[in-house]
Amino acid sequence: MGKKKNNSSNAAHVLESSVAPILELNFTDPLFTTAAHPTKPLLISGFATGHLYCNSYNGEKLEELEQVNREKAIERQQKAYEAGTITHVNKSVSQLKSKWWTTFNDIKDVPSKGEELVNVQTNWKTKRHKGSCRHAIFDPRTDCLGDYLYTCGTDNIIKKAATETGKVVGKVDVVADYSSAKDKLTKLCHSTTHPFLLSGTEDGHVLVYDSSNLGGTNKIKFKVELAHDDSINHILSMPAVSPYHYLTLGSTTLSHIDIRKGIITQSDDQEDELLAMSYTTDELSENKNDTVLVSHGEGIITIWKNSKNKLADQLTRIKVNKTASIDAIVPTMNNDDENGMASSVWCGDSEGLLHRVNYKRGRVVETRLHSVARGKSDAVDEVGVLDIDYDYRLISAGMDSLKIWSNRYSDDQEEEEEEEEEEEEEEDSVSGTDSGSDEESFSDISSVDFDSENNDDGEELLDKEQWEDVEDEDIPVGTDGSTRNEENKDNTKSEYILPFKRKRRDFSEVITKPKKKLIDINKLTKPSKKEDDGDDNNKSLQEQEKAEEVPQFKKQKVKEKKVTAKQLRNMQKHEHGIRKFEGL
């Protein structure tokens, strides 16, 4: 009996994008890390063997070659379809039998620099570490952007090398700075303004070195002990706050640290492993570090906001793939909002899928397949690393392969996204229901209490349906906590209720106007004898038949109560209520 496909793989094929890679590199040795140069078409690859490769590529030529080969392949399929040899024209990238983009079966097969004029070449390669190469990053400082490369390995050495030649210009052995001799390095992070090189360890410590003087007399500058109870999974700088402030992920918590003073705040236990994090493209372009998106081991993305609760807990969550872990996340770095790129992040999961998540809409809007299992023996290449190259192309990598994806969307893809947005807007306008009300939806809101003074800081992160999710529709509440009813002259302010504290609206409130004509049940009941006599005298047989054919809804008449003598006397004497002053 064959293995049944799960819902996530089926959904991935439905949402699969028509965008294809322009370059694919396969490896015989496990790939542990990769980094893209911020301003040049350079790619660094670090392997479990300790080797380091630097490859350059011509992105424009690869784009043109991929487009030409795609058109030829579709044309061949079209002719075969017209001839009746195939049942349909396949445009799915994951189901192709032959690839139309540039592919190398092994990175060792890439020609070296100067051998021949090709679109991909190896600039240099070296045995950088005795153990595995765990992480590699480029220097992010503006005065030397991408000029230097930093790597760390299981040999407990951090090395600094020139990007152009690969020659080591500085290194430091960190064993003496460990609290335990069995500790190992995991992640690196460099300040965008200062020569601060941070390294995370398996025991949860953060070591800070002077990158301009690696191996000098003053080795370690700062040390933050036990930032987490377990291994450091990610380090993120906060240049908009301070060059000394950073965010770290480890085990099930997120920490805000000052490398001089230690932990500033640490989040609540999320009861799920936090694997990676990134800022939003919007805030990066505006030089802000307030909103953070964190990927989880249970297949979700959570949204955090420093201005709301000092990163004590998540604000909302977005379901991505409940059968896989989200191991990598990166912003699109593209401010072009025509395709929703400015409000999206890329995620890679353990099933080899790539998801573009629009965090403002709270859903996955595009899926690409980095790896597809073919046959029983073929395993899925889990996406462990994501990056963006100098021309905003997505780079996805697992242990077995690396792909650089095209940044050009086809007309069909853009039309499909526009149709989806229009359908969503129509559904919202008709139903008005909350998109997160489904039992399977993960876009619910945390029940953390926040001050109403900060409620304006994160409104853009929540779906517009959630902001409309107000239980009392007759008296809308403004963001300042006061009612918007002009007739209400009471100056007292009603208590402001945040969207994530409100109860979900009852479904009966969604129904506005019935599509079918309502039938008055009183018309269908048997009338009394007196009413029969009156109806026979006043209505003709033709009018009765017409009334039976098209029953009309009428408002029931309320029987007026007669005023008693005592009530009349009290009204005349003004003993109850407010007196009316005549002549004023």
Curated annotation (Swiss-Prot):
WD repeat copies, ranges: 128-173, 180-219, 269-314, 378-415
Family: Belongs to the WD repeat WDR55 family.
Annotated segments matching region Disordered: 409-497, 516-563
Ranges annotated as biased composition (Acidic residues): 412-429, 450-460
One GO location term (cellular component): nucleolus
Protein keywords: Nucleus, Repeat, WD repeat
Residue ranges crossing the lipid bilayer per the database entry: none
Species in which this protein is naturally found: Lodderomyces elongisporus (strain ATCC 11503 / CBS 2605 / JCM 1781 / NBRC 1676 / NRRL YB-4239)
Places the protein is found: Nucleus, Nucleolus
The protein's name in its UniProt record: WD repeat-containing protein JIP5
Lineage top rank: taxon: Eukaryota
Gene: JIP5
Ranges of Basic and acidic residues composition bias in the record: 483-493, 528-552
A GO biological process held by the record: positive regulation of transcription by RNA polymerase I
